[in-house]
Amino acid sequence: MPMRRLNRIVWVGAALAAGFSLVAAAHAQTPPKQAPAKKAAQTNPAAKHKVAIQVNTNDKAVMNLALNNAQNIIDFYKGKGETVAIEIVTYGPGLHMLRDDSSPVKERITSMSLANSNLAFIACANTQANQSKAEGKPVTLISEAKVMPSGVVRLMELQSQGYAYIRP
């Protein structure tokens, strides 16, 4: 085998090895894909109307306004014989809406949840972890709360799925 051809084979082999190494390194550094939001948190994806309501303040009046908005929307579309799916997404100080120890509206949430299967209450796991750390004890949530990794990301996901966005 002539030396020139042997050099060419060596160079091609080295180039292929380098290429495979780069692909393997890039794959190893690619962060794992985040799991999509839990299916349990989806209210009714087939609902004709879909609404996301944001609560990010620890204010009883804002929490009640969010619940009023939800109930008014439910009543409006029920009167028209149409379905609506509503997710109330809490994060930051708004997580108090779903905290078992500090929610000023937990009885109302329980009542509304029992009456409306297409109404979901979403709690931000990031906020829950931060509040637990700051308080030095686990933050427990009411039973109606469904925990998602990030409240803000959940709002983004809902908007990309065609949910109308409301911030009372």
Q: PLM features: what roles do these ranges have?
A:
Residues 2-13:
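Bacterial N-terminal signal peptides that target proteins for export
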Residues 12-21:
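Bacterial N-terminal signal peptides
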Residues 24-30:
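Boundary at the C-terminal end of the N-terminal hydrophobic targeting segment
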Residues 44-58, 89-93:
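Acidic/histidine-rich, surface-exposed loop or edge segments in extracytoplasmic proteins
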Residues 55-67:
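Short, glycine-rich nucleotide/cofactor-binding loops
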Residues 64-79:
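Histidine-anchored nucleotide/phosphate-binding helix
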Residues 84-98, 127:
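Acidic helix-start/capping segments at beta-turn-to-alpha-helix junctions
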Residues 99-168:
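A cross-taxonomic marker for long C-terminal extensions/tails that follow the last structured domain
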